[in-house]
């Protein structure tokens, strides 16, 4: 194709993504669009087609973004090329959403006709507005008995400030309104800007590892074009590779002769090492490089940290390889090696949130068959030392000596909770119990309220979400963003077994809750740790001060069984001998800590605050 034909083709390209709160019907709508444009034959069609990970299908959530090319013949008789970039809706995967949106010019905003606007709908709309996208509202599930499209239309105008007069009324399940959505995309979403005659600039928005072809890049071409045989260069590190194949996804990968401005597809270039590519980097041609890289993504900082250790220590290298491969596909995962006296060699991993941590753990266990032990999650604290230094500490075992600590600051989040009016009291009580500070409260309509609190992130990473769902019967929706660091009265609590610290059980706690938390965990460990041949004291300590203690009684053999009657001094001698043996055992014996003990530190959080 000459450059004139390519420019003509570019005018008929539409790049869009679908954004929505969890469960508002985003993946079903994507399925219907694929059917309507006959991208997928009815034989291959299955529910949630784009959610290719088993985990996504089981949980019914979208975790990874997906990019697909569709062909659509519009009512005006022209053929259009659509690129649908599917995005996750969950708050932990906002980073995936922001990456998808950077590759689009438009966004289809799906709102449930019965539930209306939810917290993550808002969060994703703001991301779309930041990227200057054209937003097309769609009111979905209009065939539900509880649907109230007019109220939702009003909400979209009042809460988001979008003109919803032309919002499409649709039902993705029944296939109503799908054609209207496609026509609106043709009319309202702008064609990609960019110039095919300029040097190549392509944004990497994802990458996957293929055992045969190495790293495969998923890119959005912003300027120029790329074809097999070209030599590409990464702008962040200057490394060059020869392109072996370019193509598109329909969800299956299909090779093409070229990718030009506006296209979304993949590049395979025999990239062998995972570290050579980074999501957000710009690809250009080595022969005619672009002057500057594209404006990439802001680097996401992990907010929740946990130790991951293989149960079998010889699997350490397998775990490292598995984490490297996951990191390639999930740019927000960070990890570094660490050792623990209790658990051996492992990694300290950073995650965006608890669901992210959960998903990574499941993917490691499923896709790579590695059995893991996870330690309790913690957040990044700022510890101010008396000599004026400030340390960032994410691992409780790295906390400095309490006598050298001047003050400790912890991250607070701005939590936005949307909830029906009848549950406002329960939500406020929960937030108060989690050390939250009330900020403001707005009424969205007669029945729904948007409550904003500042809450310490450490309280949220435990089980805030579960508690919120149970106290509002599942009606609350929740979104959070990091607000600031604040000074808090925090202490590090150590757990001692038989007088020895178990570093993996240490945790940071607010001074006001230290005694209850210590007492609770000691009692819990007493039930979990099996009885030994000798007595085992379990202690909770802050520095040198023991705040709680419980003893696991020793198992003992009845040494008097063979004394029928007989002299009391004989019996006493046998008992004294047994006692001396137990004492010697206690001095040298070590206690095995079962996996449940580490998990119990997680699950006990709220029992102490009831």
Curated annotation (Swiss-Prot):
| Bilayer topology annotation | Peripheral membrane protein
Question: PROSITE patterns, alphabetically?
Answer: G_TR_1 (PS00301), G_TR_2 (PS51722)
Q: Which GO terms describe its molecular function?
A: GTP binding; GTPase activity; ribosome binding; translation elongation factor activity
Report the Gene3D superfamilies cross-referenced here.
3.30.70.240, Elongation factor 4, C-terminal domain, Elongation Factor G (Translational Gtpase), domain 3, P-loop containing nucleotide triphosphate hydrolases, Translation factors
UniProt GO cellular component terms: plasma membrane
Catalyses which reaction(s)? GTP + H2O = GDP + phosphate + H(+)
Q: Which cysteines are joined by disulfide bonds?
A: none
EC number(s) given by UniProt: 3.6.5.n1
Please give the chief subcellular localization of this protein.
membrane
Amino acids binding GTP: 23-28, 140-143
Q: What biological process terms from GO does the record include? A: positive regulation of translation
Alphabetically sorted, this entry's keywords are: Cell membrane, GTP-binding, Hydrolase, Membrane, Nucleotide-binding, Protein biosynthesis
The record's subcellular location field reads: Cell membrane
Domain (tr-type G): residue spans on this chain: 11-193
Q: What does this protein do?
A: Required for accurate and efficient protein synthesis under certain stress conditions. May act as a fidelity factor of the translation reaction, by catalyzing a one-codon backward translocation of tRNAs on improperly translocated ribosomes. Back-translocation proceeds from a post-translocation (POST) complex to a pre-translocation (PRE) complex, thus giving elongation factor G a second chance to translocate the tRNAs correctly. Binds to ribosomes in a GTP-dependent manner.
Q: Which family does it belong to?
A: Belongs to the TRAFAC class translation factor GTPase superfamily. Classic translation factor GTPase family. LepA subfamily.
The record's listing under NCBIfam families reads:
lepA, small_GTP
Instruction: Tell me what this protein is called.
Output: Elongation factor 4
The organism is: Streptococcus equi subsp. equi (strain 4047)
């Amino acid at each position: 194709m000459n450059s004139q034909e390519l420019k003509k083709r570019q005018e008929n390209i539409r790049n869009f993504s679908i954004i929505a709160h969890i469960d508002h019907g985003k993946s079903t709508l994507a399925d219907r669009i694929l059917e309507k444009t006959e991208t997928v034959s009815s034989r291959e069609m299955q529910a949630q087609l784009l959610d290719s990970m088993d985990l996504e299908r089981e949980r019914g959530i979208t975790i990874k973004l997906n990019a697909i090319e569709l062909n659509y013949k519009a009512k005006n008789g022209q053929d259009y090329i659509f690129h649908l970039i599917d995005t996750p809706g969950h708050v932990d995967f906002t980073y995936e959403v922001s990456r998808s949106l950077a590759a689009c010019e438009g966004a289809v905003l799906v709102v449930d006709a019965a539930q209306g606007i939810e917290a993550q709908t808002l969060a994703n709309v703001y991301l779309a507005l930041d990227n200057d996208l054209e937003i097309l509202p769609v009111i979905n599930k209009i065939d539900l008995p509880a649907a109230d499209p007019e109220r939702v239309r009003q909400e979209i105008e009042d809460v988001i400030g979008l003109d919803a007069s032309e919002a499409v009324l649709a039902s993705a399940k029944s296939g109503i309104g799908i054609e209207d959505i496609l026509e609106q995309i043709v009319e309202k979403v702008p064609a990609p800007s960019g110039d095919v005659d300029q040097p190549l600039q392509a944004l990497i928005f994802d990458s996957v590892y293929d055992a045969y072809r190495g790293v495969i890049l998923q890119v959005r071409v912003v300027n120029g074009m790329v074809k097999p045989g070209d030599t590409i260069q990464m702008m962040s590190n200057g490394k060059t590779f020869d392109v072996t194949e370019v193509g598109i996804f329909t969800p299956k990968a299909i090779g093409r002769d070229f990718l030009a401005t506006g296209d979304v597809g993949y590049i395979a270039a025999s990239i062998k090492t995972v570290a050579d590519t980074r999501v957000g980097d710009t690809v250009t041609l080595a022969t005619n490089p672009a002057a500057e890289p594209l404006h990439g993504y802001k680097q996401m900082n992990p907010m929740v940290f946990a130790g991951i250790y293989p149960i079998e220590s010889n699997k350490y290298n397998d775990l490292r390889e598995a984490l490297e491969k996951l990191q390639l596909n999930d740019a927000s995962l960070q990890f570094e090696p660490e050792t623990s006296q209790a658990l051996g060699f492992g990694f300290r991993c950073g995650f965006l949130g608890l669901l992210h941590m959960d998903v990574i753990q499941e993917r490691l266990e499923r896709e790579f068959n590695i059995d893991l032990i996870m330690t309790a999650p913690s957040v990044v604290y700022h510890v101010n030392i008396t000599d004026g230094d400030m340390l960032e500490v994410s691992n409780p075992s790295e906390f400095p000596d309490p006598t050298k600590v001047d003050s400790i600051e912890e991250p607070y989040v701005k939590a936005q909770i949307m909830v029906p009016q009848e549950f406002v009291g329960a939500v406020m009580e929960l937030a108060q119990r989690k050390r939250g500070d009330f900020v403001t409260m707005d009424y969205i309509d007669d029945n729904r309220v948007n409550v904003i609190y500042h809450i310490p992130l450490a309280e949220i990473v435990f089980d805030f979400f579960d508690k919120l769902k149970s106290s509002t019967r599942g009606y609350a929706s929740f979104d959070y963003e990091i607000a600031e660091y604040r000074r808090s009265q925090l202490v590090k609590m150590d757990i001692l077994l038989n007088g020895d610290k178990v570093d993996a059980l240490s945790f940071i706690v607010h001074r006001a809750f230290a005694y209850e938390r210590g007492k609770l965990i000691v009692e819990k460990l007493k039930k979990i740790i099996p009885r030994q041949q000798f007595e085992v004291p379990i202690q909770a300590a802050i520095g040198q001060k023991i705040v709680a203690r419980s003893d696991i009684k020793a198992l003992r053999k009845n040494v008097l069984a063979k004394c029928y009657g007989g002299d009391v001094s004989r019996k006493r001698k046998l008992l004294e001998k047994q006692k001396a043996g137990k004492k010697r055992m206690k001095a040298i014996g070590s206690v095995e800590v079962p996996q449940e003990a580490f998990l119990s530190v997680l699950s006990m959080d709220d029992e102490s605050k009831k």
